[in-house]
């Protein structure tokens, strides 16, 4: 089976050098995911030759950087022979348009002694006897012919990809991953922008928490373009014991600040240049403008919050699409360690608590469990 793969539109807008780099990364990611066949680049698209397997279709639909793709049949059209194209179109499309209202879409790259309109008209005439009629505006079925120099490609399906950028072109980011609904979606969105996530989980729920986090990451791994996901699991119970020393209403913000501090150390250790969270503005008390300011105060790495403007319904909808929702919904809200958390914590108060707690963030990270998925 031959598949034509169309990269995301924004890749075509890059400089020639960046475009080559992005397309090269996309090709490598496809190789890692499909694990078979032959792939090559040609005039703004990629071609993939694989065994006839529907599994490949499903896997390609989760590779970021792909706008769409189509299984195709092809012929060499020597000497600009339009008759060859018409005959092949009848062979490929006669059954597809049978008893249906159809349209023909054609486009060309290269020099030919006929136009795209000629192809549409002549192929349409040849297929008309098999059909129920032609309607260019609202057909029941569309058939496509793409002529690239001396090769013509025939297809009738355009399968959508997830678009975005190939995973790996934007470096790495440390993701604070609770395993709730939000953090897997934030991870997915950063992968969509070409980033490889390094996962940091504070385990506050023992083996159950660990189990569901691993299941969620197994789902996200299918979207990673073949890149392995590295997971650091920190024993959050020890941190909670420390936090019991401070005022109860400040504990949620302080817990988040501890997570940021450990994430900062992980960035140092893994040579990562950013931190990502699943926070959404004003969704909960720790995510008010004031508390976000306090939480990230003094952190030296940029903090990305891809869900900052999303409401919960939008996040849930994405989680269902990704496939993580069925696991996230089973997890308790482990980070909700106070029922009366403040919506506006004073920075000076938090910094004083931080000094008194004297948490060794390096040691917290050193004692983490590391898993590669």
Curated annotation (Swiss-Prot):
EC number, as in UniProt: 2.8.1.4
Main localization category: cytoplasm
Localization in the cell: Cytoplasm
GO molecular function, one term: CCA tRNA nucleotidyltransferase activity
Family: Belongs to the ThiI family.
Reaction(s) catalysed (UniProt annotation): [ThiI sulfur-carrier protein]-S-sulfanyl-L-cysteine + a uridine in tRNA + 2 reduced [2Fe-2S]-[ferredoxin] + ATP + H(+) = [ThiI sulfur-carrier protein]-L-cysteine + a 4-thiouridine in tRNA + 2 oxidized [2Fe-2S]-[ferredoxin] + AMP + diphosphate; [ThiS sulfur-carrier protein]-C-terminal Gly-Gly-AMP + S-sulfanyl-L-cysteinyl-[cysteine desulfurase] + AH2 = [ThiS sulfur-carrier protein]-C-terminal-Gly-aminoethanethioate + L-cysteinyl-[cysteine desulfurase] + A + AMP + 2 H(+)
Pfam families for this protein: ThiI, ThiI_fer, THUMP
Classification via PANTHER family: TRNA SULFURTRANSFERASE (PTHR43209:SF1)
Residue span(s) of domain THUMP: 54-158
Role noted for this protein: Catalyzes the ATP-dependent transfer of a sulfur to tRNA to produce 4-thiouridine in position 8 of tRNAs, which functions as a near-UV photosensor. Also catalyzes the transfer of sulfur to the sulfur carrier protein ThiS, forming ThiS-thiocarboxylate. This is a step in the synthesis of thiazole, in the thiamine biosynthesis pathway. The sulfur is donated as persulfide by IscS.
Pathway linked to the protein: Cofactor biosynthesis; thiamine diphosphate biosynthesis
Keyword annotations from UniProtKB, A to Z: ATP-binding, Cytoplasm, Nucleotide-binding, RNA-binding, Thiamine biosynthesis, Transferase, tRNA-binding
Name the record gives this protein: Probable tRNA sulfurtransferase
One GO location term (cellular component): cytosol
Annotated gene: thiI
InterPro entries: Rossmann-like_a/b/a_fold, ThiI_AANH, ThiI_fer, ThiI_N, THUMP_dom, THUMP_ThiI, tRNA_STrfase, tRNA_sulfurtransferase_ThiI
